[in-house]
């Protein structure tokens, strides 16, 4: 099974999460990583992509640039580019829904194999998951 998690808020990394770096970089990231790592231990799960928003902000460091930035055995972190390079707090993501959907669909189009399931974390990610279902028919679950 290939699971794609979408979590757009905060400064997500696979290791050494900078908790508190921004107001949006908190416990929800810890729970997401624990879920991904526990799922990776399941022999039926062969791949997990964590998709988040990429940005360039010298105050926050260079590691948040768009692209595939980190990889583990089964878990990969992918940062999509929505055309706005600045870090955006969660309250401002709603202004980028169209661009984020376009970037997420482009990421999915570029995959040889589509995810079996998308797990969207919070409302903004739910909008992307719904769009992926419309375009590709990929089922999704939503937690907020």
What are these regions (language model features)?
Residues 3-4, 133-144:
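Active-site proximal beta-strand in glycosyltransferases
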Residues 108-125, 139:
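Short N-terminal targeting/anchoring amphipathic segment
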Residues 51, 121, 141-143:
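A cross-family glycoside hydrolase active-site/sugar-binding cleft signature
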């Amino acid at each position: 099974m290939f699971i794609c998690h979408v979590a757009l808020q905060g400064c997500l990394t696979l290791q050494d999460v900078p908790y508190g770096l921004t107001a949006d970089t908190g416990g929800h990231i810890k729970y997401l990583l624990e879920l991904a790592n526990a799922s990776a231990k399941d022999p039926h799960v062969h791949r997990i992509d964590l998709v988040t928003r990429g940005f360039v902000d010298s105050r926050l460091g260079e590691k948040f640039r768009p692209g595939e930035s980190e990889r583990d055995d089964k878990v990969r972190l992918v940062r999509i580019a929505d055309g706005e390079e600045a870090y955006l707090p969660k309250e401002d993501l709603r202004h980028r829904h169209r661009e984020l959907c376009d970037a997420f669909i482009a990421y999915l189009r570029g995959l040889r194999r589509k995810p079996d399931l998308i797990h969207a974390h919070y409302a903004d990610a739910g909008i992307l998951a719904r769009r992926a279902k419309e375009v590709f028919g990929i089922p999704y679950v939503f937690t907020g």
